[in-house]
Amino acid sequence: MAVSQSSYRGCLLGLAVGDAMGYTVDNRSWQEIQEDYGPNGLLGYDLVNGYADVTSYTQLAAFTCNGLLFGLTRGQMLGKMAPFIKYVGMSSREWAASQRPWGRPTRNYCWLLRKAELCRRHCMDTRMLDTLSRPTLGIPETPANNYDSPGGITTAIGVGLFFHEDRTDQHEIDLLGAEAVALTQGSPSAFLSGAVLAHIMSRLLRQPHLPLKRLVMEAVEAMKEQFGHQYSQAFEVATLVRHAITYSESPNLSPVDVMER
């Protein structure tokens, strides 16, 4: 199925909308949110000078797309290219450089660096930024750390958007989703979640008529089959996803109840 440009834009815009609203309450308890925003919590954007910000999760997803397109373009125009994960690492490093006011490279490859609104310093995950400043990034087999924070998860969204049956198969995209997250988050529970997310995004784009629950469960089963023999955490991730589905379908649980579990 052909995918329109508006579908890609819609995915990234949806991420930007949710991220811009949610980043202000990231890592806060329900009580803390109520103290700041009232008994019903956050009900809209927390605007800065009248605007909702494009924050770090959205930035990282966009830079991942930029890096993958850069690599693909070089392959098509020059007939040579490195593995796709190398371009994800390159674009992630350039994004990290945009998050600090010093030490920016004089030569870069991501045109998004010229978009000031995509380079605002909003990343609070200093450990991830530190990892991206090191000479060697992580891979699933040789992790750079044991971080399980969600900081790098949106790289998998860029990977999922990149899927096309003429250049990659689903197995390769799922692996690339895991590898992209593993660059900065070494915990298997983190990078295996990247495989699940890349699978869901790639399938949603091409078969939007399929029920979301079916696609999510398909992604979980694919992740277990591909990684379960090597990582026991694959089954833990699968259990958490099943819990999320159960909670979402329960008429007796409010979103707040689910958040507090």
Predicted segments, located by residue:
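Structured, active/binding-site neighborhoods that engage oxygen-rich ligands
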Residues: 1-261
